[in-house]
């Protein structure tokens, strides 16, 4: 159901469904990843407030702790670039560190394209 809401760009409903799934599947990294994607609400990270960004990063970090995957690090790199770098805010790790991790864990172009497709945000060249 959560994926249907996400495909229909019903981000609040999708987030609620993924949040409920986290309770029942707390060891499934993808649930945390997609919950974080929902918080973007189809808008660039740059346009969100810091509290929303922090929640996204919390969910991505949870996904990484369960199963480190390249696309999770890429999502983190996207946030670190589009929010922190564009607002001239220093953060550790920075987007370059996250990109390095994404490549270390393997992040094929198909995963990156899928991220941008489900997130509903324009593709950003952060390399």
Task: Cite the ranges covered by each PLM segment.
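Terminal, low-structured helical/coil segments at or just beyond the last alpha-helical repeat
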Residues: 86, 90-127
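Short coil turns that delineate tetratricopeptide repeat
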Residues: 26, 66-68, 104-107
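Short coil/turn linking the two alpha-helices of tandem helical-hairpin repeats
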Residues: 9, 36, 40-50, 77, ...
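Canonical tetratricopeptide repeat
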Residues: 34-35, 75, 115
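Alpha-helical segment of the N-proximal tetratricopeptide repeat
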Residues: 1-10
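Start-of-helix register in tetratricopeptide repeats
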Residues: 30, 71-72, 111
